[in-house]
Amino acid sequence: REPADAAVREKRAKIKEMMEHAWNSYKRYAWGLNELKPITKEGHSSSLFGTIKGATIVDALDTLFIMGMESEFQEAKSWIAENLDFNVNAEISVFEVNIRFVGGLLSAYYLSGEEIFRKKAVELGIKLLPAFHTPSGIPWALLNIKSGIGRNWPWASGGSSILAEFGTLHLEFMHLSHLSGNPIFAEKVMNIRKVLNKLEKPEGLYPNYLNPSSGQWGQHHVSIGGLGDSFYEYLLKAWLMSEKTDLEAKKMYFDAVQAIETHLIRKSSGGLTYIAEWKGGLLEHKMGHLTCFAGGMFALGADGAPEGRAQHYLELGAEIARTCHESYNRTFMKLGPEAFRFDGGVEAIATRQNEKYYILRPEVVETYMYMWRLTHDPKYRKWAWEAVEALESHCRVNGGYSGLRDVYFTHEKYDNVQQSFFLAETLKYLYLIFSDDDLLPLEHWIFNTEAHLLPILPTDQKEVEVKVK
C-alpha cells in the first residue's frame, strides 16, 4: 500500500530506484559473486564467506520482496535453487554466514513461503553445528564447513571467541529448530546463555572476549560497538520474539543495560550523549558507527522497561540518534565516519585517519527507523532524507554504490566495494522510514542484525526451550 502523502510516496519511490540501481549493477558486473566492485565493475569476494558465493543475492532477497521487485526476486530465487552451494572446502565466519545467509534465507521463506529457502536455511544451519564442538560449547569464530574444524580469530585475546559473534546466533537458531523440528539448534544457543549466566560479570558488564576452552573471560574490554553490539540486541529481541515469554533474556537485557548506563554512557560538554568503550575499568571516549544501532535498541526495549523507566529509554534512544546525526552533520560528505571521539575538545568527530571511512553502513538509519516508528517525530524522516541525498551525491557511481575512504575530504575517494548489507539493511531501513507502519509492523516482526525479518515465534517453540533447561 502506497503512503497517502505524495511527497512521502515520491521519496519512497526514489529509495526503490536506488535499490534497482544497486541490484542491476551487481547483476550486470558481479552476478553470482559475493559483492560488487562498483568502480572497476567486477566481482568482489570477501574471505568472510570462504568460497560460498552469492552473498548479495541472499542478503537482498527480502528487500526485493518488500519493495515489490518481483522479477528480481524470482531471478534471485532461481540462482539460489540452482547455484547456492554449501559443500565447499573453505573456512567461513560463523557469525557472518549466520546473519547474512541463514538470516536472509529464513526471512525470504517467511515472506514468500517458498520451500527452497527453508530447505537451504536448515541445510546451512546443520553445516554450522560443528562450530559448537568446544569444551564449553561456546562456538568457534571460524569454521571449515567441509572438515568441521574450527578456530578463533588469531588477533582475539588469548584464543577467545567474540561476544557479538557467539551472541548473535540466538534468533536464527531458534527459528531453525522451529522450522526443522530439530531441537539441536535451540539447545546450542540456550547453552551459550547458560555459560554466560554462570560467569561473574565485571561491574555487571559483559567483556567482548570469552575463551571457548576454559569458558572464562579473556581481556576485560567492553563495547556496545563492534565485538559486543549485537549480543545486547539479541537479548532484547529474543525476549520480544518469544511473545515476551523468555523472561531470562529480558532480565539479562535490562541488567546489562543498567550496567551500560552506569559505566559507559556519558554526556559531552556540548550536551551530546554517547556510549564510550571500557578497557579494564578505563573509558575510551570513542563511539563507533556500529554503536549507533543502540538508539533504536533502547527505544525498542522501552516498552518492557522496569516500572516508570519507559519514557527514559525512549529519550535515551532519541539522544543517541541525535549524537549519531551530529557525527554525520559534522563531516563534509554528510555521512558518518566509522568512529568518532569525544576528547581533547572534539565532539562527534573522527580524529584518526583510519576511522574516517564510511562503508555504506546502516546503523544510523536503523536507529532513525525505530525512532520514527516509535515516536513519529518528523525530524527522523528529515534526517533519513539527508542520508539519502548524501548517498546519492557521494556514493552513487555509474557501476553501483561505493563506500568512501574519508568523509571529511572535499572530494570522493572511493573504496570500490558495494557491501551486501547496503541492499539488505541500509536501503531497507530507509524504505521503511518512508512507508506506513503497517508494512512489517514491529509487533509481528523482529529484524535480525542484518535487517532480515523473523516473525514472533508461535508458542509451540517454547517446548524446545523448556526441554533444554
UniProtKB/Swiss-Prot annotation:
Any one Pfam family match given in the protein's UniProt record, by short name: Glyco_hydro_47
Topology in the lipid bilayer: Single-pass type II membrane protein
Chief localization: Golgi
Keyword Kinase: no
GO molecular function: calcium ion binding; mannosyl-oligosaccharide 1,2-alpha-mannosidase activity
EC numbers for this chain: 3.2.1.113
Glycan attachment positions: 329
Disulfide bonds: 292-324
Alphabetical list of Gene3D superfamilies matching this protein: 1.50.10.10
Active site, renumbered: 338
UniProt cross-references to InterPro entries, sorted A to Z: 6hp_glycosidase-like_sf (IPR012341), Glyco_hydro_47 (IPR001382), Glycosyl_Hydrolase_47 (IPR050749), Seven-hairpin_glycosidases (IPR036026)
Pathway it works in: Protein modification; protein glycosylation
Lumenal side of membrane: 1-469
Compartments where found: Golgi apparatus membrane
EC class of the enzyme, as a word: hydrolase
Binding, Ca(2+): 449
Regulation: Inhibited by both 1-deoxymannojirimycin and kifunensine.
Catalytic activity entry: N(4)-(alpha-D-Man-(1->2)-alpha-D-Man-(1->2)-alpha-D-Man-(1->3)-[alpha-D-Man-(1->2)-alpha-D-Man-(1->3)-[alpha-D-Man-(1->2)-alpha-D-Man-(1->6)]-alpha-D-Man-(1->6)]-beta-D-Man-(1->4)-beta-D-GlcNAc-(1->4)-beta-D-GlcNAc)-L-asparaginyl-[protein] (N-glucan mannose isomer 9A1,2,3B1,2,3) + 4 H2O = N(4)-(alpha-D-Man-(1->3)-[alpha-D-Man-(1->3)-[alpha-D-Man-(1->6)]-alpha-D-Man-(1->6)]-beta-D-Man-(1->4)-beta-D-GlcNAc-(1->4)-beta-D-GlcNAc)-L-asparaginyl-[protein] (N-glucan mannose isomer 5A1,2) + 4 beta-D-mannose; N(4)-(alpha-D-Man-(1->2)-alpha-D-Man-(1->2)-alpha-D-Man-(1->3)-[alpha-D-Man-(1->3)-[alpha-D-Man-(1->2)-alpha-D-Man-(1->6)]-alpha-D-Man-(1->6)]-beta-D-Man-(1->4)-beta-D-GlcNAc-(1->4)-beta-D-GlcNAc)-L-asparaginyl-[protein] (N-glucan mannose isomer 8A1,2,3B1,3) + 3 H2O = N(4)-(alpha-D-Man-(1->3)-[alpha-D-Man-(1->3)-[alpha-D-Man-(1->6)]-alpha-D-Man-(1->6)]-beta-D-Man-(1->4)-beta-D-GlcNAc-(1->4)-beta-D-GlcNAc)-L-asparaginyl-[protein] (N-glucan mannose isomer 5A1,2) + 3 beta-D-mannose
Swiss-Prot/TrEMBL keywords: Calcium, Disulfide bond, Glycoprotein, Glycosidase, Golgi apparatus, Hydrolase, Membrane, Metal-binding, Signal-anchor, Transmembrane
Job description of the protein: Involved in the maturation of Asn-linked oligosaccharides. Progressively trim alpha-1,2-linked mannose residues from Man(9)GlcNAc(2) to produce Man(5)GlcNAc(2).
Family to which the UniProt record says this protein belongs: Belongs to the glycosyl hydrolase 47 family.
Protein name per the record: Mannosyl-oligosaccharide 1,2-alpha-mannosidase IA
Organism encoding this protein: Oryctolagus cuniculus
Organism lineage: Eukaryota, Metazoa, Chordata, Craniata, Vertebrata
